[in-house]
A protein has these predicted regions:
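Selective recognition of specific alpha-helical transmembrane segments in multi-pass small-molecule
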Residues: 9, 13, 17, 119-131, ...
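Membrane-water interface regions at transmembrane-helix termini and the short interhelical loops
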Residues: 27, 95-116, 180-183, 292-304, ...
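TM-loop-TM module centered on a large, flexible mid-protein loop between adjacent transmembrane helices
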Residues: 32-39, 207-257, 273, 307-309
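Hydrophobic transmembrane alpha-helices that form the core helical bundles
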Residues: 44-80, 256-272
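Membrane-interface loop-to-helix entry segments
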Residues: 101-131, 306-317, 338-343
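Hydrophobic, membrane-embedded alpha-helices of multi-pass small-molecule transporters
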Residues: 130-137, 145-211, 247-256, 341-351, ...
Length: 399
């Protein structure tokens, strides 16, 4: 239970707060969500952070992972021992279609998303009810950090969803879309983003809780697997047979496909606006890179992404935090930059530790062994920022 709570905090709670923060940061600024949220940062720092997020959500991790999840849950179960050899061919076909749709965005993507989302939710509801009514196995034995620090372990595992980074990326895009549609006032923008966040939070919570329950009743159903997709596949096969497994494969494949198109389009749009290349060239480049990255395999990609996410996620969390409390800073520009600098430095230490580097010199830091060395210094810096007095007040006292 503590692990599930920790996971939901970072995989559901933080994305919801992030969407609200994007709307709050845009209040009265007359600019897009990202520009408004990072207005106290140097332009180069805000741009570097945006580039890092779009690369992570684009060709480096999130987009290739959609193809890998589709492969693991959509095709590999039907290939048996030949599954590993089919990854290259599958990724070529999958991302070729993603590139084609991304090059010509239109009604196709809207139609697929419109009908796919309800179908996916119905399928997940059926799976959740099946797991509750007819669990297929027993509860597996907890091990490692799931015994010692389950709450923190759950929080760190929630990083892997990348949902907070996605909320920063798509929240800013939604603000821009609302502004283009003539919705300029803050109350309306706040309302729409909050409603969207609440709907997604409820849906994600239902999905994650049902998957937690599935994992807690999977002992004996499957053995010797190295990722969650294989567990879900084996469970569905045991619960519904090959027909249910086929339906799950089709829906997951389509869901991953539309996610890949959305991520690729958003990333290409951003870099098109940032650099001189055309949108189509960016789509082709990022699609090809996604093919290469996807062929490392799902488990390996997740392992490679963990140190990066451990380093960058605290920065995103701190950005959301200071967006809510910046009105309490006596010198908002100074405090804002100090908080982000501190969290970046300590987040990098956590990331290096997660990568397996020897970091004994920093073992004295509170929560360093838990991957949360950034937490206390960030909160302390934020508190000090609230104690700073405005220049005007100091000048008045001096006079």
């Amino acid at each position: 239970m503590p692990a599930m709570v920790g996971f939901l905090l970072t995989a559901v709670g933080l994305p919801l707060l992030t969407l609200v923060a994007v709307a709050r940061g845009s209040a009265g600024q007359g600019s897009s969500g990202w520009t408004a949220m990072t207005r106290y940062l140097p332009t180069w720092a805000a741009t570097a952070l945006a580039i890092a997020i779009y690369i992570i959500m684009g060709p480096a991790f999130a987009t290739p992972r959609t193809g890998l999840v589709a492969y693991e849950m959509g095709l590999k179960p039907w290939l048996g021992e030949a599954g590993q050899h089919g990854l290259l061919l599958y990724s070529l076909c999958f991302f070729a279609l993603v590139i084609l749709v991304s090059l010509d965005r239109g009604r196709l993507l809207d139609a697929v998303g419109k009908y796919l989302t309800p179908a996916l939710m119905v399928m997940l509801l059926i799976l959740a009810l099946g797991v509750i009514i007819a669990p297929q196995g027993g509860m597996p034995e907890a091990s490692g950090d799931y015994i010692d620090t389950p709450l923190i372990k759950g929080m760190l595992e929630g990083y892997n969803t990348m949902d907070t980074l996605a909320s920063l990326m798509f929240g800013a895009l939604i603000i821009g879309l609302l502004q283009r549609k003539g919705i300029e006032d803050y109350p309306s923008q706040f309302k729409y983003l909050t409603i969207a966040g609440l709907i997604s939070a409820v849906g994600l919570s239902a999905v994650y809780i049902s998957l937690f329950y599935l994992g807690n009743s999977a002992a004996g159903v499957v053995t010797n697997v190295d990722n969650g997709g294989a567990i879900v596949n084996a469970y569905v096969l045991s619960l519904f047979g090959h027909y249910g497994q086929l339906i799950l494969a089709a829906i997951i494949t389509l869901a991953c496909f539309t996610s890949a198109v959305g991520l690729l389009c958003a990333s290409a749009d951003y870099f098109h606006g940032l650099a001189g290349w055309t949108y189509r060239k960016w789509v082709l480049l990022m699609g090809c890179v996604s093919i290469l990255v996807a062929n490392v395999g799902l488990s390996q990609l997740i392992s490679l992404s963990i140190p990066v996410l451990v380093a960058i996620y605290p920065v995103a969390i701190a950005l959301v935090l200071v967006t809510f409390v910046q009105s309490y800073f006596g010198r908002p520009r100074m405090a804002f930059r100090a908080v982000l600098l501190v969290v970046f430095l300590f987040g990098c230490l956590d990331g290096l530790g997660a990568a397996g580097m020897q970091m004994k010199a920093f073992a004295f830091l509170p929560l360093f062994d838990k991957g949360l060395a950034w937490l206390l210094p960030t909160l302390l810096t934020c508190g000090l920022g609230m104690l700073l007095r405005p220049r005007e007040a100091l000048a008045a006292e001096a006079a």
